[in-house]
Curated annotation (Swiss-Prot):
Entry's localization field: Plastid, Chloroplast
Cofactor dependency: Mg(2+)
Alphabetical UniProt keywords: ATP-binding, Chloroplast, FAD, Flavoprotein, FMN, Nucleotide-binding, Nucleotidyltransferase, Plastid, Transferase, Transit peptide
Species, as recorded: Arabidopsis thaliana
Disordered, as annotated region: 228-248
Molecular functions per Gene Ontology: ATP binding; FMN adenylyltransferase activity
Coiled-coil region list: none
Annotated InterPro entries: FAD_synthase (IPR015864), Rossmann-like_a/b/a_fold (IPR014729)
One term under GO cellular component: chloroplast
Protein's recorded name: FAD synthetase 1, chloroplastic
Lineage of the species this protein comes from: Eukaryota, Viridiplantae, Streptophyta, Embryophyta, Tracheophyta
PANTHER family: FAD SYNTHETASE 1, CHLOROPLASTIC-RELATED (PTHR12714:SF20), PROTEIN-S ISOPRENYLCYSTEINE O-METHYLTRANSFERASE (PTHR12714)
Gene Ontology biological process: FAD biosynthetic process; riboflavin biosynthetic process
Length: 354
C-alpha cells in the first residue's frame, strides 16, 4: 500500500490566535505521526486539470499567466495524480488564509494538494455567480503560498461534483484511499462531505482510520477580532467578523471593505478584466472598462484609492478605481494608456485593490 498500511493518525491543530503572514501558531495533539512510504516524499507527477487556459491570442498580466502551465503526466505505474500526497479538502472558492492554513498543514506532512469539486452550481441548481478568484489567477495565488509550504506550491486537483455527488461518506473516503491513493487528508473542523453533507470531521477521522490513511483536522481560522461581541452598539460590519470563510469575503467585497478583504485573503484582492483592445479607451489618464469584462468579483460600488493596475510584464501602475453598476473606471497619472500588445484582439488587465 502507498502508506505502508499504517494506521490512521489524527492531529488537531489549534488556531485560537489570529493568523499573520508567516506566523505558525499551532498546538498539536499527543498522537504520533506514522510516516508513509517513500513514495509520499516525492513530488508525484500529475495530469491535473489546468486552471490557466485562455485563448491563445490573449495576452495577460505577467505574474498571472506567464509562469507556464505545468502538465505533469501520470507516473509510469499509472498512479493517481494525487497518489501518495496529502490532500486538503474544501471548496477553495476564495483561496483565503483558512484555505492556506490547510495547505500549510498538508505540506508539513507530505506533498500538498488541494482537492476541490467543479460543477456544483450546475448539479445543485445554484444561481451562477462570479468567482472570487479568476480561474486564470489561481495558479499565481497558489504559487505565492510556496513560502509557507516548504517552498512547494500546492497543486489544485479537481473532481467533477456530478461523479461523487451520490457517494455516502464511507464511499467517498474509499475513493480517496483506493482510487486516488492519497496518503492523508487535512480538513477544517466544520468540514462536511458525502451525500447531502451527511458526514462531518469526526466521521472523516473514523473512516480514514478504517481505510488506513491519516486524517488531520484543524480548528477554524479567525480574523483579527477573533470573537465578535453582539451588542446593540456594534455596527453591521463588526457583527460579520469572526471565522474566515469565502462567504465572509463575498460580504466584505459587497460592502466595499477592501481592507478587511485583504486581511481575510492574506493578499490584496485582484480583479482580472478581459477586454477587446479596440474597446480600451484612455482619456487623460482615465481607462473605462465594462463590468461585464471582469472574470471575477469586484468590490461593491464606490471609489477605491491606493490601487494598482497590472498590464503584461510592466511594473504595476498606481491608480484610483471607481466601480459602479455597469462600469469600472481606472484613473492614473499617466496621460496615455499603453497596451502591452496592440496587435492582439483582447487585453487582460489586473486591477489590485488595497
Amino acid at each position: 500500500m502507498l502508506c505502508g498500511g499504517s494506521r490512521a493518525s489524527v492531529h488537531l491543530w489549534d488556531h485560537r490566535h489570529p493568523p499573520r503572514l508567516g506566523a505558525k501558531v499551532l498546538r498539536k495533539s499527543s498522537f504520533m505521526l506514522r510516516p508513509c512510504s517513500a513514495i509520499s516524499q516525492q513530488r508525484i507527477k500529475s495530469s491535473f486539470r489546468s486552471h490557466c487556459k485562455t485563448p491563445r491570442k490573449i495576452p495577460a498580466p505577467l505574474d498571472c499567466f506567464s509562469q507556464g502551465d505545468d502538465h505533469p503526466e501520470l507516473s509510469a505505474e499509472g498512479l493517481s495524480p494525487v497518489a501518495g500526497g496529502i490532500v486538503a479538502l474544501g471548496k477553495f472558492d476564495a483561496l483565503h488564509i483558512g484555505h492556506r492554513e490547510l495547505a500549510i498543514q498538508a505540506a508539513r506532512i507530505g506533498t500538498p494538494y488541494l482537492l476541490s469539486f467543479v460543477g456544483l452550481a450546475e448539479v445543485l441548481g445554484w444561481k451562477p455567480r462570479a468567482p472570487i478568484v479568476a480561474k486564470c489567477d489561481r495558479k499565481r495565488v497558489l504559487s505565492s503560498w510556496a513560502s509557507y509550504c516548504g517552498n512547494i506550491a500546492p497543486v489544485e486537483f479537481e473532481i467533477e461534483f456530478a461523479s461523487v455527488r451520490h457517494l455516502n461518506p464511507q464511499q467517498f473516503v474509499e475513493k480517496l484511499s483506493r482510487e486516488l491513493r492519497v496518503c492523508g487528508v487535512v480538513a477544517g473542523e466544520n468540514y462536511r462531505f458525502g451525500y447531502r453533507a451527511s458526514g462531518d470531521a469526526s466521521e472523516l477521522v473514523r473512516l480514514c482510520k478504517d481505510f488506513g490513511i491519516s486524517a488531520y483536522i484543524i480548528n477554524s481560522v479567525m480574523d483579527k477580532n477573533q470573537v465578535s461581541v453582539n451588542t446593540e452598539e456594534e455596527d453591521s460590519k463588526s457583527k460579520e467578523r469572526g471565522q474566515v470563510s469565502s462567504t465572509r469575503v463575498r460580504h466584505a467585497l459587497a460592502a466595499g471593505d477592501v481592507r478587511y478583504v485583504t486581511e481575510l485573503l492574506g493578499r490584496p484582492h485582484r480583479v482580472i478584466s478581459r477586454t477587446r483592445t479596440q474597446d480600451l479607451t484612455s482619456k487623460r489618464g482615465r481607462i473605462s472598462l465594462q463590468t461585464s469584462s471582469l472574470l471575477n468579483l469586484p468590490p461593491g460600488n464606490g471609489v477605491y484609492k491606493a490601487c494598482s493596475l497590472i498590464v503584461g510584464d510592466k511594473h504595476p501602475i498606481s491608480c484610483k478605481v471607481i466601480v459602479d453598476t455597469s462600469n469600472l473606471y481606472i484613473e492614473t497619472e499617466e496621460e496615455r494608456f499603453h497596451n502591452s500588445d496592440e496587435s492582439q484582439e483582447f487585453q487582460l488587465l489586473g486591477i489590485e485593490f488595497g
